[in-house]
């Protein structure tokens, strides 16, 4: 299998999926669980926010603090659960790509690899966080030394001249103007972040597959081996991503639907119901659209990526697929 031949990868992926008896059942379970977890987390977060709004006074401070903490932890718990589920789903797609039997039970593998997956995710987060910080430190001096910052200087100079002993005081209108004037700096920082993060992203692209394929591997080893595997092939992986444009375009449409309650008023379209109803309405449509995209498209995409991984990994002695879990996880 040649990663440079995207058509060959896709055709082989279609053949593997056609022979996978449990392929549609796997994506059905994965999609339903993902959507159910997202829906429950959103509803619980809304209920918590309503309860927080009802608590007031010193007597309710403890309850309010507990509810606020629960609301803050909820997205973290959701992200960790979906992270494990995602890895388990990828393991089933890797089995299908290799012509091996796979079933929904295989999605438990992500939870079996929880600690190494968590460490790997945290390490990648630190790496990308460092990239973001570096891009910001580069973008701000560029912004300040170019005419892009003139509007900020025009806003700040009168404030500095009139500053008293208490320092510079900003009213809401001035603060809004300052944020608008800083927008070029944010755009410049974002562009630099993308330019710096893209090579890093493709460098560690195969780390999750290595965690699946090698039960004894650690987080650092997975990142290191991924870097070695993708060396010289990052452009080919990028080309493969571009060939999947239809999937990513569909996901962007679903995200736009999720923010429909905010986008439509910005376009001058007034919605005939309250903000809360509009939020949950568009969120429900977003979940439905996401389910359709996952159910009909996700398997094709992930089996193709699994084949790309197999085309890059060094040839090793066969072990009958034991690296993907025991018989009860297949």
What does each model-found stretch correspond to?
Residues 1-330:
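Hydrophobic alpha-helical membrane segments
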């Amino acid at each position: 299998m040649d990663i440079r031949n995207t058509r060959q990868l896709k055709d082989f992926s279609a053949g593997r999926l056609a022979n996978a008896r449990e392929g549609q059942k796997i994506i059905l379970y994965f999609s339903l669980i993902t959507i159910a977890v997202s829906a429950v987390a959103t509803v619980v977060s809304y209920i918590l926010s309503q309860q927080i709004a009802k608590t007031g006074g010193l007597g309710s401070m403890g309850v309010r603090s507990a509810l606020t903490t629960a609301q803050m932890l909820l997205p973290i718990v959701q992200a960790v659960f979906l992270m494990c589920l995602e890895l388990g789903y990828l393991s089933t797609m890797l089995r299908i790509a290799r012509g091996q039997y796979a079933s929904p039970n295989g999605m438990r593998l992500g939870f079996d690899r929880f600690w190494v997956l968590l460490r790997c995710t945290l390490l990648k987060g630190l790496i990308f966080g460092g990239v973001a910080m570096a891009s910001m430190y580069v973008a701000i001096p560029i912004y300040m030394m170019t005419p892009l910052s003139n509007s900020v200087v025009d806003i700040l100079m009168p404030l500095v001249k009139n500053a008293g002993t208490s320092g510079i005081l900003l009213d809401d209108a001035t603060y809004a103007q300052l944020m608008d004037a800083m927008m070029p700096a944010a755009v410049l920082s974002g562009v630099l972040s993308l330019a710096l993060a893209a090579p890093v992203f493709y460098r560690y692209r195969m780390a999750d597959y290595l965690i699946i394929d090698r039960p004894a591997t650690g987080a650092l080893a997975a990142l290191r081996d991924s870097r070695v595997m993708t060396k010289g092939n990052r452009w080919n992986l990028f080309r493969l991503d571009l060939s999947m444009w239809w999937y990513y375009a569909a996901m962007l449409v679903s995200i736009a639907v999720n923010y429909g309650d905010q986008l439509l008023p910005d376009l001058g379209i007034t919605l005939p119901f309250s903000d809360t109803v509009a939020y949950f309405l568009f969120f429900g449509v977003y979940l439905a659209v996401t389910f359709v995209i996952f159910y009909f498209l996700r398997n094709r995409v992930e089996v193709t990526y699994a084949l790309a991984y197999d085309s890059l990994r060094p040839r090793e002695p066969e072990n009958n697929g034991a690296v993907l879990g025991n018989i009860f996880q297949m």
